A protein has these predicted regions:
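Glycan-recognition and catalytic cores of secretory/periplasmic carbohydrate-active enzymes
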Residues: 2-586
């Protein structure tokens, strides 16, 4: 068995500390979620890992929603929940791939030979493709050595690097992904139809209750009536770079990083050329707005994408460019270069300079169309503002964020925040379990997204408090300041009885408290810099004792019933990110 480097810094926490309430709540929350997740899995999945529902294609209740029912489970295990969580979500992923490979459409030509091909969506948009990777893309946090996982990571990335002749999604000359609809069978190079989006006709009234509110299939079609302009590139496709960063963190092969940066850098250039606003359509010839009559704001899910809600006749803004921020975060993770953060910060500021005073109130635009900026609201445009601040740690970026909640706690303004939000999570789990137990749906009256509201994994609070991190969205990697490993069990996650609270973050420092709630057993925990060892730990201080580190992790021995504040100096984004666990590197 590989041993930890004996020359690395080892810390000791031996100050007797009665277990703080937050620590007891944290440990119990991990335990309670595990029990609730087991009940959820037993209720909605069969022995093969198939979701017990009617499998359909489409943007409302499609394949992505089926596996999204386990959103948060990979993080839950990586935080320290039992291995049963890992086993369940891996089983569900295997079942998901089989279930949606077998599932075929009749009327929708795109998926008549299977909704998945080569274990990947055949051809759909990255609003949904990304959601469908919410579980798989985070498996590397806990189980990067799984051979099937490794094979898929490389295959999926290859779909966007022209390594598969059946999937010519990427144009290296113009540095574009050639359509909003793309996947294992390549890009769709025609206008999409409402049927392409909605899926095959289906009985609705009396059988299903679509979560988008449609009362019949005609309304499902009407929902997507205007979703036609999908040819050419769109910021949504930047989410595909999460496949590239995953493959790079798995293999360390330069080709994955090179492709990721080539593609993101092309978007950096387009945004700069467009006055600092990321365009929502790039033509097949590489020109801004090339498939939309030269309109940089055109296209499905674009800056001008305001559609009619069929049930009410009202208008709904469905600009989805904000999901493109994933690509800039991936580029930052791969390089540590803050210019990728600058792009998004500059865009937020540029949009808000177009403010207007309307009826005596300052209003800020959120959409752009033929008549210029519109959809003015009292709140400044702030999509991605939390990411910008978190990645930069530039205090000037706090201007777009509320100084309450988690940010307020990190700023020292809400000392009771941890206990309050942890207690709230218990209420959330109770409510979801009650809803699940009252659910009267059957497999043949259940859409793929119906169980989602009952998913008891509540990891947002734990991610903030334990890791000092952002909750991953839509297939994105985990961005966090620290992560924990159990060196005795050789697994990811904080060891039994240990609790951690990140109390303060600065550009070069993290302050956290470690507690061992067991009065009997000593525990050993590894603290790693970042989710993927991207941050270098310079030193750690416990009281007056400062220990030099200069490595990506530290080992901490915590005596029975002991606890202490640990102040860690670090250099963020100093290392290349990797899935490799601490004991197998350095």
């Amino acid at each position: 068995m590989t041993k930890l480097n004996p020359n690395g810094g080892t810390l000791s926490v031996d100050t007797p500390t009665p277990p703080p309430t937050w620590a007891l709540l944290q440990r119990e929350l991990l335990r309670a979620q595990t029990l609730a997740c087991q009940e959820f899995f037993d209720r909605y999945f069969d022995d093969r890992g198939y979701l017990l529902c009617i499998p359909r294609w489409g943007g409302n209740d499609g394949p992505d929603d089926a596996i999204e029912n386990l959103t948060g489970w990979p993080i839950l295990h990586a935080l320290g929940a039992p291995d049963s969580i890992l086993h369940m979500y891996k089983k569900a992923w295997e079942g998901h791939l089989s279930q949606y490979t077998e599932a075929k459409t009749v009327a929708v030509t795109l998926a008549q030979d299977g909704m998945y091909y080569k274990e990947f969506p055949v051809m759909f948009d990255w609003f949904h493709n990304a959601e469908g990777l919410t579980v798989f893309n985070l498996q590397g946090l806990s189980d990067p050595d799984d051979l099937a996982f490794q094979s898929r990571v490389k295959r999926y990335a290859g779909f966007y690097m022209n390594e598969d002749p059946q999937a010519p999604n990427y144009d290296p000359e113009h540095k574009i992904i050639r359509s909003m609809f793309n996947g294992s069978r390549g890009p769709l190079l025609r206008k999409a139809t409402a049927l392409d989006w909605a899926g095959d006709p289906i009985e609705v009234e009396g059988r299903f209750k679509p979560l988008h509110g449609e009362r019949d299939f005609d309304e499902m079609l009407a929902h997507f009536e205007d979703y036609t302009d999908i040819v050419g590139d769109h910021p949504l496709n930047l989410a595909a770079t999460s496949l590239g960063i995953n493959a790079y963190m798995l293999t360390g092969e330069a080709k994955y990083k090179q492709w990721l940066l080539e593609y993101v850098d092309a978007w950096v250039e387009r945004t700069a050329a467009n006055g600092g606003i990321i365009p929502s359509n790039i033509g097949l010839d590489g020109t801004v707005g090339g498939e939309c009559g030269g309109k940089w704001y055109g296209g499905c899910y674009g800056w001008a994408f305001t559609v009619v809600v069929p049930q009410t006749g009202g208008l709904s803004d469905r600009n989805a460019i904000s999901r493109g921020i994933a690509g800039f975060g991936n580029a930052l993770l791969a390089t540590g270069d803050q210019r990728y953060v600058d792009v998004w910060r500059n865009m937020i500021d540029t949009i808000n300079t177009n403010q207007r005073t309307i009826d005596g109130q300052v209003m800020y635009p959120h959409m752009y169309g033929d008549e210029g900026w519109y959809s003015f609201k009292p709140q400044p445009y702030s999509q991605g503002a939390l990411d910008v601040y978190y990645w930069s740690m530039n205090r000037a970026d706090l201007k777009h964020l509320p100084t309450t909640g988690w940010i307020g706690f990190l700023e020292g303004k809400s000392p009771d925040y941890p206990e309050e939000v942890l207690q709230r999570d218990f209420s959330t789990i109770r409510r979801k379990v009650e809803g699940m137990r009252r659910d009267t749906s059957t497999p043949d009256t259940r859409m793929s997204d119906d169980p989602m509201g009952f998913n008891p994994a509540a990891v947002g609070t734990l991610t903030e408090l334990m890791l000092g991190g952002l909750t991953p969205r839509h297939g994105e990697p985990l961005h966090c300041r620290v992560r924990y490993f159990d060196p005795l069990k050789r697994r990811a996650g904080i060891p039994e009885d240990v609790a951690a609270l990140v109390e303060k973050l600065t550009d070069d420092e993290v302050t956290l408290t470690l507690v061992n709630i067991s009065p009997v057993e000593a525990r050993t925990v590894i603290i790693q810099g970042g989710a993927y060892a991207e941050h270098q730990l310079i030193s750690a201080a416990i009281g007056d004792q400062v220990t030099p580190l200069d490595r990506s992790f530290a080992t901490v021995h915590v005596a029975p019933g002991a606890g202490s504040r640990v102040v860690i100096k670090m250099k963020r984004y100093a290392n290349q990110p990797t899935f490799v666990f601490p004991w197998a590197r350095d």
